[in-house]
Amino acid sequence: MALSTDTTTPCLRPARAPTPLEVEEVVSLRGLEQLQGEWRWLWTRCPTATTFQRPEWLLPWFRSFGASFSSQPPWVITLRSEGRLVGLAPLAIREENGGRVVRLLGEGSAEHLDVLMDPLLAPHGVRLLFDWLALNGERWDTCVFEQLRESSPLLHKPTPEGWGDRTETREPCPRTGLHHYRRILWHGPERKV
């Protein structure tokens, strides 16, 4: 590409295509602890992130309640771009009513839960997360994402073809008066949750 020597013409630089995102799974408390520095950095990049998404809150929560929350290890999905952490979905799979339910870590004792996604990559990142869940569909029956705010990227991304999808408005937060939302996703027959 030739650059103009005319100073009134803006210089043109080749556009750089976004790099593909890499998906990794973290399935142990130790693995989560090793992510703390990157996790904090990602948290600072997300303008709508809450205290309940910080490692300083979720790691002690998991140490205290993880075993009673799920008999299985955590199932945290991370997204990386050029080696940098750009997405984190802190999940666990629980046995409920004879089914396997994917839930966000921290549920039950936090007001606002969500995934952390770099704002520039959030729509693509959530799509990749849903694709990853679809690829691992033999591990779960239903996803239930509770205590989501209206701005949650989990609420607004279409699901893969063939999935069931229901969003419900929940009780408002007692401190802010803002409503929480619950999104339920499933593949195969719908189960009661």
Residue ranges and their predicted role:
Residues 1-193:
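N-acyltransferase acceptor-side catalytic subdomain
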